[in-house]
């Protein structure tokens, strides 16, 4: 009984520690993104106009109002920030509007916006194409030096462009401009959603807990031997 309690306590502590680290890292990445360049969102920016009714401004980010998810980014304005290369946009996949215009960006991968399923407006330097191509947006236009991509289309409805078809017992859902993902329906799981029945959560957690205890015991025993030898 005591051993079971100890194992459960160790597992709970490990989970809590991992969740704490994830929370701290998300705070750091949010701060890094919102302070990528000096100042704050310009008052003549489309992101500012959007944010004054939907949320509040912090640095170059717009956060959602009236929600327990106080760190939910719904707008991002990195225009005129002298950005030449964009690899990722950290925790801003919940953004509805993003402005990257007036930057010397020469190339922008579509994968930067993978997971941005809620994005409805994207402003880019005019020489860049909208992620996913014109077919992924309801409206694409160029105004002066800015390309505006509006109204992200649901990739699941564009069967001609889909390189893969979701397997049986799964559901297609949008996953950013030109992207989609397949999620297993209720009561199905595993490879290609071929397994039916509840996911064996208790069994998996038991295996993970046992593995953690074994590895920890081996490391502890090894360290003890080193201490005794010295």
From Swiss-Prot:
The lineage of its organism: Eukaryota, Metazoa, Chordata, Craniata, Vertebrata. Keywords: Cell membrane, Differentiation, Disulfide bond, EGF-like domain, Lysosome, Membrane, Nucleus, Signal, Transmembrane, Transmembrane helix. Involved in osteoblast cell differentiation. May play a role in inducing the cell cycle arrest. It comes from Danio rerio. This is All-trans retinoic acid-induced differentiation factor. GO terms for biological process: cell differentiation; negative regulation of osteoblast proliferation; negative regulation of protein catabolic process; positive regulation of bone mineralization; positive regulation of osteoblast differentiation; regulation of gene expression. Residues 1-26 form the signal peptide. InterPro entries: ATRAID, EGF-like_dom, LRR_dom_sf. It comes from the Eukaryota.
């Amino acid at each position: 009984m005591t051993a079971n309690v100890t194992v459960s306590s160790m597992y709970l502590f490990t989970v809590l520690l991992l969740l704490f680290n994830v929370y701290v890292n998300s705070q750091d990445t949010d701060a890094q993104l919102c302070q990528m360049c000096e100042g704050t969102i310009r008052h003549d920016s489309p992101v500012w106009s959007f944010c004054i009714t939907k949320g509040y401004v912090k640095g170059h980010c717009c956060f959602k109002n009236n929600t327990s998810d106080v760190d939910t980014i719904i707008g991002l304005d990195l225009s005129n920030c002298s950005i030449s290369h964009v690899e990722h946009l950290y925790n801003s996949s919940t953004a509805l509007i993003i402005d990257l215009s007036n930057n010397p960006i020469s190339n922008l991968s579509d994968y930067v916006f993978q997971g941005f399923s809620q994005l409805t407006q994207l402003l880019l330097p005019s020489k860049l194409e909208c992620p996913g191509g014109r077919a992924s947006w309801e409206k694409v236009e160029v105004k002066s030096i800015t390309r505006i991509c509006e109204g992200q289309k649901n990739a699941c409805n564009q069967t001609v462009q889909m390189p893969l078809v979701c397997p049986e017992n799964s559901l297609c859902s949008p996953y950013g401009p030109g992207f989609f993902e397949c999620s297993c329906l209720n009561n199905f799981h595993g490879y290609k959603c071929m397994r039916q029945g509840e996911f064996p959560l208790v069994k998996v957690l038991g295996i993970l807990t046992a593995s953690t205890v074994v590895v920890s015991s081996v490391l502890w025993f090894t360290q003890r031997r080193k201490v005794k030898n010295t």
